[in-house]
Design a protein with these regions (language model features):
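N-terminal hydrophobic/helix-forming segments and targeting peptides
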Residues: 1-216
Length: 216
């Protein structure tokens, strides 16, 4: 666990962000967007806001994907105070009222960045390292697919290689800032014992894997 405000290399652990609700209502009171029905509907790390807004101003705050007109994009604003919504391009075209009521019920507070780790000790101290990120909501390929694969790898090793030759380390963390936090504590140990590592990401598609050689 890393407290808000902790310096990790030249980064700072940010405040914890929590969301209770977010929606857009038209002038008749009908919800045309509801975070509780689609977790991708909000720009993550949005500041709280609650007000009536003109359509011309609202559409400036709505994110969509031109290439996938029926898809709702995943958008974040971790390093800039902002707010916004996400919806499909085709849904955006159907907005036909002059005014809308928006509500983003969020808060920021001092909290913790948490990392999950599982270590399987082998006969040899040399480690095979696996890492995946857990910060993307409601998306199967990016990145529930990799979380599922990593969990099943742990299960497979426990059931079939109880006395493995190599040691295995599995890490679950928030993307980028989580990796930086982890390395700030474990880099020396990893440099000493890690033989090779796998970063698991988007394993639900048919793309090829990529190989990155060590600078050493």
């Amino acid at each position: 666990r890393f407290k808000t405000g902790t310096k990790v290399f030249d980064w700072i652990v940010p405040q914890e962000w929590n969301i209770k609700d977010a929606y857009i209502k038209d002038s008749s009171g009908k919800k045309i967007l509801d975070f509780k029905k689609n977790l991708l509907s909000i720009v993550y790390y949005s500041i709280p806001i609650k007000k009536w807004i003109l359509k011309k101003d609202l559409i400036k705050k709505i994110h969509f994907d031109n290439k996938l007109p029926n898809a709702v994009p995943y958008v974040t604003s971790y390093y800039k105070k902002a707010w916004g919504f996400c919806m499909s391009k085709n849904r955006l075209k159907k907005l036909n009222k002059k005014k809308y009521f928006i509500n983003i019920d969020t808060n920021f507070k001092k909290g913790f960045l948490e990392i999950g780790e599982y270590f399987k000790k082998g006969k040899n101290k040399k480690e095979i390292f696996f890492s995946t990120y857990i910060c993307h909501p409601s998306m199967a390929n990016d990145n529930l697919s990799s979380i599922a694969v990593q969990l099943n790898l742990i299960k497979y090793l426990k059931e079939n290689y109880r006395n493995s030759f190599f040691s295995y380390r599995f890490v679950f963390l928030p993307e980028t800032i989580g990796s930086i936090c982890y390395l700030s504590k474990k880099k020396d140990k990893l440099k000493k014992n890690m033989m090779l590592g796998f970063a698991l990401s988007c394993l639900g598609d048919d793309h090829n894997y990529s190989l990155i050689k060590s600078r050493n």
